[in-house]
Design a protein with these regions (language model features):
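Membrane-embedded helix-loop-helix hairpins and adjacent transmembrane boundary segments
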Residues: 1-671
């Protein structure tokens, strides 16, 4: 009965949304496009989510934490897919495929493979014990307050990093489509997050996530079909876009061999060589460059120079590295960026393109390391694993994972198609155009977000060359309809889908953090006699506080969305995967072993990120060497083995678990 009612309700909702899109399209054709379309596509869905959240409000403890454990498997799979398909997937993944080609398939393969691990290794056993949170599961398995506290801290850390990435995505969407400042867009998005989760907890989040999945999947399938038909690929290009790949490969070869392109790349190499000279002359070059800026600013002020130039020099001086050590980090990054732009275009179809085996091997290692981290991180994310506690039974949890994979596959089969089509549009319609006739979308995006796209005439010939286009991956999806020449209503649809992806994941993460604080720390460690009503109230207050703090951190714009997501996966894998797997499948795992494994994995992962990621190196002035050339986004490849090794060794050296613990593991292992 419940399933039939849900199918009827969400079918009507889907038809209503598609009719809403068609209506706006007709209005645009009749009255013309404008920023009002962006407002409508952002605020009308938020209003719908608010209504669902209001109707799902509850103060019942089981409803608030796990939606009453009565969510049908198909709908839980849809909600989990929405929880999973974050701003990084929607905004960043197609951009990474566009920029790096084959290398970005690590995200698709890693994330999809992770759900196989969820199905076979964890979801049924987590559901069998039927706890409210993952720290609750581990605290019960090891009968330890220390394990619970440590797991709660790790869940808060990895979820918070992931949450910041989602809120940054919301800020980017609001900035582009309603024209507000990035920070204001973030706090507008905060309201959207809270209306979905504040009143109803997991119950409200579940039903809003189902609604959000319908919007986000429509927002990827419809534009892909429209752009494909424009390129002669038909309305379902997911299984037949090889012809377009051949056209892209041919144009990439032309760009690679073009003399003008080589002149542009030579210009970047000369700029990189100049920066290398400055690096070689440190610290003298630091004092010289800083002195030059100070002298220029003083001269402009003395001669009443233009306010714009004075402001530019003041900003440059404020952003100048604080000491020679920080200058080395910043200038090294600038040199590397120039050298990357000086490289020939990366062929989309070719695995690990490189001039030699010495260049290819690090790329292969990083591909495998990232794939591994994403797979293990997927199987360890608390906000994903907790979703399977909302199903009606262990068997339903297994079926729910299958539905999750199906709904995610609908999205992931479309993303590579979009990346290929947008790359073809850029190569065919932007490269080779005169600078005097740049498309409107280039100037508009550069006006709103100059860091996302820039086209500079490096060799002064008045023609746009591939190497002169600097386009951040995060803008590829949001700008796709404009790049392909589609109506602005399709851009609004993309914005609604991106917002749905960011909100759905942000809601799940926010609830995970608030529940870890209220249930695992407040209830189990501070006030075990607290009433159910008080526990729900505390969770709501904490949810509001965490949302405000995460929005503030996101407004600082601390890193690329895709990097923040990758870091969250590495943190989750390093802290949770060893102890979850050992806790379920090895009775010999002890409390001390679990604590040692979690601490070791987390410390190794955090150290590697902080010591090798340029943003942190700039903050601290310390830049450590990479291990085996592995990038910081894949730090979990070191944290997970360290966590397993330490947990196993300490458990073997410790006393065996008692009879109760062994019986509990047997109970968990027979779902």
């Amino acid at each position: 009965m419940l399933t039939r009612r849900l199918i009827r309700a969400y079918a009507l909702y889907t038809l209503g949304f598609l009719g809403f899109v068609l209506l706006l399209g007709r209005i645009e054709r009749a009255a013309g496009s404008g920023v009002w379309i962006g407002y409508v596509f952002l605020f009308v869905p938020i209003a719908v989510y608010a209504v669902i959240g209001l109707l799902s409000r509850t103060s019942d403890l089981v409803e608030y934490y796990v939606a009453g454990r009565r969510v049908p498997s198909a709908f839980n799979g849809m909600a989990t897919a929405a929880d999973w398909l974050s701003a990084a997937s929607f905004i960043g993944l197609a951009g990474s495929l566009y920029a790096t080609g084959y290398d970005a398939l690590a995200y698709l393969m890693g994330w999809t493979g992770g759900f196989c691990l969820v199905a076979f290794l964890l979801a049924p056993y987590v559901r069998k014990l039927a706890r409210y949170t993952i720290p609750d599961f581990l605290g019960t398995r090891f009968s330890s307050t220390a394990v619970r506290a440590l797991a709660a801290g790790a869940a808060i850390l990895c979820s918070f990093v992931y949450l910041v990435a989602q809120i940054q995505g919301i800020g980017l969407i609001a900035t582009r489509f309603i024209g507000v400042d990035f920070a204001i867009g973030i706090f507008c998005g905060l309201a959207g997050i809270l209306v979905c989760s504040f009143l109803g907890g997991m119950r409200a989040v579940t039903w809003t996530q189902v609604a959000q999945y319908i919007i986000l999947i429509s927002a990827i399938l419809i534009p892909v079909s429209l752009i494909a038909m424009k390129n002669g690929l038909g309305p379902v290009p997911q299984f037949g876009y090889g012809q377009l790949m051949e056209r892209v490969a041919a144009r990439e070869a032309q760009v690679r061999d073009s003399r003008d392109e080589q002149r542009v790349r030579d210009a970047y190499r000369r700029q990189a060589a100049h920066i290398q000279t400055q690096l070689d002359r440190l610290p003298a070059s630091y004092a010289q460059e800083r002195g030059r800026l100070v002298d220029q600013l003083a001269d402009l002020r003395r001669h009443n120079g233009p306010l714009r130039e004075i402001s530019q020099r003041e900003r440059a001086l404020a952003e100048f590295p604080r000491d020679p050590a920080a200058a080395r980090v910043v200038w090294s990054q600038a040199r590397d960026d120039l050298l990357a732009r000086a490289a020939p275009p990366v062929p989309m179809h070719e695995p690990f393109p490189a001039a030699s085996d010495d260049e290819r091997r690090p790329r292969e290692r990083n591909f495998l390391a990232l794939l591994l981290c994403l797979s293990l991180g997927t199987a360890s994310l608390p906000h994903i694993l907790t979703r399977y506690n909302t199903t009606t039974s262990v068997a339903s949890a297994r079926r729910s994972v299958g539905w999750t994979l199906f709904f995610i596959a609908l999205f992931y089969l479309s993303v590579p198609v979009l990346a290929v089509m947008i790359k073809y549009e850029i190569l065919a319609n932007l490269v080779g155009r005169p600078f005097a006739a740049l498309p409107a979308w280039v100037t508009q995006w550069h006006h709103f977000e100059p860091d996302l796209i820039g086209v500079v005439d490096e060799i002064r010939d008045g023609i746009v060359h591939w190497s002169e286009i600097q386009m951040q991956p995060d803008m590829v999806v949001l700008a796709a309809p404009e790049i392909a020449g589609l109506p602005y209503v399709v851009s609004g649809l993309i914005a609604a889908g991106a917002l749905a992806a960011a909100l759905s994941t942000a809601d799940g993460l926010l609830l995970t953090i608030a529940n870890a604080l209220s249930h695992d720390i407040y209830y189990h460690m501070v006030a075990p006699d607290a009433s159910s009503q008080r526990r729900v109230t505390i969770s709501k207050v904490l949810l509001l506080g965490v949302a405000l703090f995460a929005s503030y951190v996101a407004s600082l714009n601390t890193g690329k969305i895709l990097f923040l997501v990758g870091a969250a996966f590495s943190l989750a894998a390093s802290s949770f995967f060893p102890v979850l797997v050992l806790g379920v499948f090895w009775k010999r795992t002890t409390t001390r072993g679990a604590i040692a494994g979690m601490v070791t994995g987390l410390v190794v992962c955090v150290y590697y990120i902080v010591s090798t990621y340029p943003y942190f190196a700039q903050l601290t002035g310390f830049a450590g060497p990479t291990w085996f050339g592995i990038e910081p986004i894949s730090s979990g490849v070191f944290g997970v083995p360290a966590g397993f090794a330490v947990a196993i060794v300490v458990s073997l050296l410790d006393r065996r678990s008692d009879d109760y613990t062994r019986a509990l593991v047997d109970y968990i292992r027979h779902p």
